Amino acid sequence: MTKVRLVPWSEHDFQLLVRLNAPEMTQHLGGPETPESIQLRHKRYVAAAKSGTFSDDEKGYAAYIFKAILEPDGVAVGGVNFWDRDWNGETVYEMGWGVLPEYQGRGIASAAVGEAVELARATQRRSAIHAFPSLDNGPSNSICRKAGFELRGEVQFEYPKDHWMQCNDWVLRFAS
């Protein structure tokens, strides 16, 4: 069984974010971000990992940002995050993840998502967590299914800003 440990994002994780921004990693997300955007994202990740909050246009919202460490090797192999999102009149968590190409297909993303779901549940702040993989991202849609998410259907989704894509809306409701 694949063992993954989630560790809060740190200032030392910039190169991991650069690698997660590679074309093969962002093909389902509208392509790579600019170097400037990645630097800003890294700063937001570090700040959120320290404070538990993202700040956007003077509005703050909860965010949990982690790198995924493959055990027992202790190697950073990707990231998994969840954050507050208003969705269909409800404040829920949204989750996203990525695993470096050379580590894909080994159950690492599934293990990391499973760990993150348990962390999200433990916050007791939200009743559900959603994931929005693009329709053509078979592996991420499979991860949602394996993690116990329920497929709600197709939706138009903006990510990154000003880029609209067709996604599946997966939800996992936490028992109250």
Q: What do the PLM-derived regions correspond to, one by one?
A:
Residues 46-67:
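A short helix-loop-beta-strand connector motif used in the catalytic cores of GNAT acetyltransferases and
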Residues 1-28, 65-176:
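Acyl-donor (CoA/ACP) binding surface of acyl/acetyltransferases
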Residues 35-39, 138:
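An alpha-helix initiation/capping motif
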